[in-house]
Amino acid sequence: MARIAGVNIPTNKRVEIALTYIHGIGPTTAKKIVTKLGIAPERRVQDLSDNEVLQIREAIDADYTVEGDLRRQVAMNIKRLMDLACYRGLRHRKGLPVRGQRTHTNARTRKGKAKPIAGKKK
């Protein structure tokens, strides 16, 4: 297994697909990396030489924020919004949808499991 950006990428998959196992690299970015380095996209990871794996590793380290750094950056952005006490920060703090979705009904993923309230007694 090749280890790139702290992730063991699967050896039996195509290079483009295998790179998407790294957090922060999607299909488009993987395709850009492969074409930039001149690696055939249909090649499998197990067929890559050590030099090619090193080239991929260096390209990712130089040009992209991935894995732990990306997760930390996203968490810091959310924390910054919460510290500013802006509308989006308050929504994050309360655990409600941030991007204007309705909350009268729905939003269960963000709000969590419904809390039962006493029903109407007959």
Curated annotation (Swiss-Prot):
The region called Disordered is annotated at 95-122
| Role, per record | Located at the top of the head of the 30S subunit, it contacts several helices of the 16S rRNA. In the 70S ribosome it contacts the 23S rRNA (bridge B1a) and protein L5 of the 50S subunit (bridge B1b), connecting the 2 subunits; these bridges are implicated in subunit movement. Contacts the tRNAs in the A and P-sites.
One GO cellular component assignment for this chain's record is:
cytosol
Protein's recorded name: Small ribosomal subunit protein uS13
- Matching HAMAP family: Ribosomal_uS13
Q: How does the record describe its quaternary structure?
A: Part of the 30S ribosomal subunit. Forms a loose heterodimer with protein S19. Forms two bridges to the 50S subunit in the 70S ribosome.
What are the protein's UniProt keywords? Answer: Ribonucleoprotein, Ribosomal protein, RNA-binding, rRNA-binding, tRNA-binding
Q: Per the UniProt entry, what is one GO biological process?
A: translation
Q: Any keyword Cell wall biogenesis/degradation?
A: no
Q: What species does this protein belong to?
A: Zymomonas mobilis subsp. mobilis (strain ATCC 31821 / ZM4 / CP4)
Q: Name one GO molecular function term.
A: tRNA binding
Read off the PANTHER family from this record: 30S RIBOSOMAL PROTEIN S13/40S RIBOSOMAL PROTEIN S18, SMALL RIBOSOMAL SUBUNIT PROTEIN US13M
User: What family classification does the UniProt entry report for this protein?
Assistant: Belongs to the universal ribosomal protein uS13 family.
Q: InterPro entries from the xrefs?
A: Rbsml_uS13_C, Ribosomal_uS13, Ribosomal_uS13-like_H2TH, Ribosomal_uS13_bac-type, Ribosomal_uS13_CS
Source domain of life is: Bacteria
- Return the Pfam families for the record: Ribosomal_S13
**SUPFAM superfamilies per UniProt:** S13-like H2TH domain (SSF46946)
